[in-house]
Amino acid sequence: MAAALLPRAPLAHTLSLGIVGAGIGGLASAVGLVSRGFKHVTVYEAAPEIGEVGAGIQVAPNFCRVLSHFGVLDRLTPQAVRLGGASVRRYVNNEQLNSTSFANLEPDYGWPAFVVHRGDLHKALLDRALELGAQLKVGSQIEDVNFEDGKVKVKGQPEVQHDVIIAADGIKSAIRSKMMARRGEVDETIPTGEAAYRVILQRSQMESAPDLKQLIDNPTAIRWVGPNAHIVAYPIKAHAAFNIVSTHISNTVGLTEDWTARASKEVMLKRFDGWNETLMKCLHLAPEGELVEWALRIHLPLTGWIDHKVVLLGDAAHATLPHIAQGAAQAGEDGAVLGTLLAKCHRKEDVPHALKMYERLRKPRADWAVEMARVTGEALHIPDGEAQKARDEALKKASTGSQSPDRWGDKETQRKLYGLDVVKQADMEFSRL
């Protein structure tokens, strides 16, 4: 579906907007602004170049809606896999505990669910942002930000002043740390005690085994749930590749500055020894020497996202666990809402009100999504025993409409996540004033 032309912002030629961070959140905010006609949008990225990174990522219906607003969704679909459903299975014997069809998503919410490679999503957002006039400055290490006057100091360069600075610098956000320190608060990310392995297999590795070929051919996301761990897997790259991500208890990562560690394939295989044969076949195919284990951390809900001319967005504002596939989606919604509200401003004096409304609309929803991801992880990782048996029974009953302990497949959670058009909501809320 082609994106409709968006109304041009009254202050399109007036406001100067600086975005710190060129991840998905930063680029989503850039596209959200330039698609409204803003002419002075600069994205600062510390990395010396932009490259394809990451693995698979789920694009839920609410994120599809935002990407369509941005004119980006059509660029993704040739490389995407449209999910037909999800299957939750017991780790040891591959027994299906729950099957959720996604056939209802487009009729109910207007959009399907896709899975893509993160690099494809990132490139689509970057291309769209640059196409519409955003400036990207790589190798731009931010040394300081002045909250009151909107000045940004990039290492080795003179200060630049913006009317709004959007901090999309991720869970390790230095700008968030400064903001919290100004409030007398301590900025601290919280180790969850969990880590993740990420594996991508190619179709050529899987075609000779019928059970593996079925996995990559079938547009279904699978969760294998076990004691203190679960694994999610699905095809990406138009079924040319297969994405596998584990979440598991680990004490080996999280102490280094970058929260990652080079991982041993042998250790990974030992960790999941005893899981079902089909999954273990996949893990044995993981390329040698390419495995990385990274720590999963969260941040407690912040007291606020705004300080004068600086506003937080994406993981800098609401870092989450990946268990309901909403990290990128919520960052995308942030960018869409912020662009919508700033486009409503007729005077620079209106901007502080737009920022406050952004926080009022976005913070409760994003914080709720973070909590839903947390409780889902707890439910998926229950050790074998009576509590696990009760969880499995609840998963089976959820196939017929009961509440699911896996909130990603829970109908009521889906309704809250997928049923809200955040752009329309922002437009209506601003118009009521």
Regions found by a protein language model. Name each.
Residues A3-T14, G18, P78, V88, ...:
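C-terminal helical "tail/cap" subdomain of flavin- and related membrane-associated enzymes
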Residues S16, K39-H40, A241:
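Residues at the starts of beta-strands that form the adenosine-phosphate
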Residues I19-R36, Y44-A47, I166-A167, A233, ...:
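Conserved mid-domain beta->alpha element of the FAD-binding
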Residues V31, S35, V41, P48, ...:
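Preference for well-ordered, secondary-structure-rich cores of eukaryotic proteins
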Residues I50-G51, A174-I175, A319-L321:
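Catalytic P-loop NTPase motifs of RecA-like helicase/translocase cores
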Residues V53-R128:
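Active-site-adjacent segment of FAD-dependent monooxygenases/related oxidoreductases
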